[in-house]
């Protein structure tokens, strides 16, 4: 399993609107992508304008296909409420209590 962690900084006091946009506009797009597993959105309790969006994918290839195909459109949808450009980092999932993982890969 593979994860994309997207670090977002909303305009001041826009994190709730950003979270709503992700839930209402972006999650439906993600659900249509091959290999998409889950999306988790975290809002910092120390800095409410900082948001992490974690998307989980069956394989690195699935995540990369999304990056090449849909991500620019998604970023444009979020742009009006963002203070800075999103920062994307990727990780291989090795342990999860919520998803089946076998030898560092989705079961």
Please state what every model-predicted region is:
Residues 2, 9, 40-49, 76-107:
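Glycine-rich beta-strand-turn "strand-cap" elements at beta-sheet edges
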Residues 4-7, 56-57:
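A short alpha-helix capping/helix-coil boundary motif
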Residues 9-22:
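Short, surface-exposed ligand-recognition loops at beta-strand->loop->(often short) alpha-helix junctions
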Residues 12-13, 47-48, 58-63:
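Short, charged/polar surface micro-motifs in flexible loops or helix N-caps
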Residues 24-25, 29-37, 56-90:
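An amphipathic, aromatic/His-enriched active-site/gating alpha helix that lines ligand/cofactor pockets
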């Amino acid at each position: 399993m593979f994860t994309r962690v997207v670090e977002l900084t909303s305009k001041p006091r826009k994190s709730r609107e950003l979270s709503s946009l992700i839930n209402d506009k972006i999650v439906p797009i993600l659900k249509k992508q091959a290999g998409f597993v889950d999306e988790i959105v975290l809002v910092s309790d120390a800095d409410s304008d900082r948001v992490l969006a974690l998307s989980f994918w069956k394989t690195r290839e699935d995540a990369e296909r999304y990056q090449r195909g849909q991500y620019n459109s998604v970023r444009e949808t979020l742009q009006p409420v963002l203070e800075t450009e999103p920062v994307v980092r990727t990780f291989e999932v090795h342990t999860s209590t919520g998803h089946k993982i076998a030898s560092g890969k989705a079961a």
